Amino acid sequence: MKFVNDGGALAFSHRGEQVRIESWGRDALRVRATRGREFSGHDWALTEPVEPAPAQIVIEETEFRDGDGSFVRRERASITNGRIRAEVNHAGVLSFFRDGSLILREHFRDYDGAISRESRCLKLAAREWKGLPGGSEYQLKVRFESGKGEKIFGMGQYQDDCMDKKGCLLELAQRNSQISIPFALSSLGYGFLWNNPAVGQAVFGSNYYEWTALSTREMDYWITAAGSPRDVLERYTAVTGRAEMFPEDLMGLWQCKLRYRTQEEVLAVARKYREEGIKLDQIVIDFFHWTVQGDWRFDETYWPDPKAMVDELHAMGVKVVVSVWPTVDRRSENFVPLLDRGLLMRTERGALQTYDYEGDCVELDAFHPEARQ
C-alpha cells in the first residue's frame, strides 16, 4: 500500500478501495472511500464553502511485526489540521486524535495489520463493502471502537427517552414523528457527521460503533475536534450551514387539531381566543382539507372561501399553517400531468409504487428539480 500527498489531501489505495482524507474547515477532516474508479464529487450535507486549511501530512516507514513473527518495514501516514490528527497504519486502519489524545479509532479485527490484536480471527473489516446485485452500489458498514465512558449526544429526534445515545440502535431514515440527523456529539470532544444520504442505521454499542448505509457508491464522513460542545457545534454549522433565528411569532402559541373539518371551525377557534384575550400566533389546518390527495386545493364544499378566511385570521394577527402532502391520488386532476412529465416516484425497476391510504396513491418526487417548483 502506498500513501501519497494528493494536493494537500492524504490518499491511498488498498485492496480495491480508494481512500481520501482532507482538511474541511477548522480543526476538521473529511474522509471518503470508494470501490469505484473515482469519487462522485457530491458534497451532500457539506453545503458551505470553506476556506482552504493547509494540512500537515507525514508519510514515513516504520517497523511492523508480521504475522509470522518477523519484522518488516511498511509505510504509515498522518494528516493534521489544527487540533485534529488522523493516523493511518500500513493496512489502512484509521485513528483520530485531539491534541495528541486518542478520541476515535476504527474497529478492525483481521490479520492484515490490526492495531488491536484481540479476536483477529473474526476477520472484521473497519470498512465493509457488500456489492448489491445488478448495479454499482454497495451496502456499507463502517465500524469504530467504543470509547470507555464515552457519551454520545445528538442524532436528531427519536421516539425514545435516551439523551445519551450510547447503547442505542438508531434508524437513519425520516418517518412521521422521527427526524434523523446523523451528527453525533461525543463527550470525548469530537463531532462526527455521517455524510451519506442513504437509509441505514447507527449503532452505538458498548463493544463497537457501526454505521450502515443500505445502498451507496461511496463512504463519506466528516469529523472535528474541539475543546467544548459549543466549539464542536460552531465548526459543524460552519460547514453545513446555520439556521436563521426563528421569527418571534413562530416561538409563540400554536393551535392545532387533528383535524379542522371546515372553514367555520377554524374561524370559530380563532375568534374564541380573541374573546378570551389570548394572543394566538399560528393556527394549523391539517390534512384532508383537500378534495383528493394531489389536488392541493381546498374542498369548496367545506372551505367555500379560503381567501376570506385567511384575511380574517391575518386581521386578528394569526398566521395560517396549511399541511401539504406529497401524495397524489390516481383520481387527482394532477396525476396524469405529473406522470407524463416523470415527476412521480418510481421503484428501481421503473414501476410506480402505489399504496392504499384514503385512495390509491403515489408520491411526488421531491428530488426532481421541476417537481420542487
Regions found by a protein language model. Give the residues of each.
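N-terminal accessory segment at the very beginning of proteins
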Residues: 1-250, 255-258, 262-271, 282-285, ...
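Short secondary-structure boundary/capping segments
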Residues: 38, 270, 297-302, 335-341
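Short acidic, glycine/serine/threonine-rich loops at helix termini
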Residues: 204-206, 294-297, 331-337
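Second-shell loop/turn segments in exported
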Residues: 255, 297, 362-365
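Soluble non-cytosolic domains of exported or imported proteins
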Residues: 260-264, 303, 366-373
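Short, conserved phosphate-binding/catalytic loop or strand-edge motifs used
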Residues: 285-292
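Active-site-adjacent "subsite" loops/lids of carbohydrate-active enzymes
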Residues: 326-373
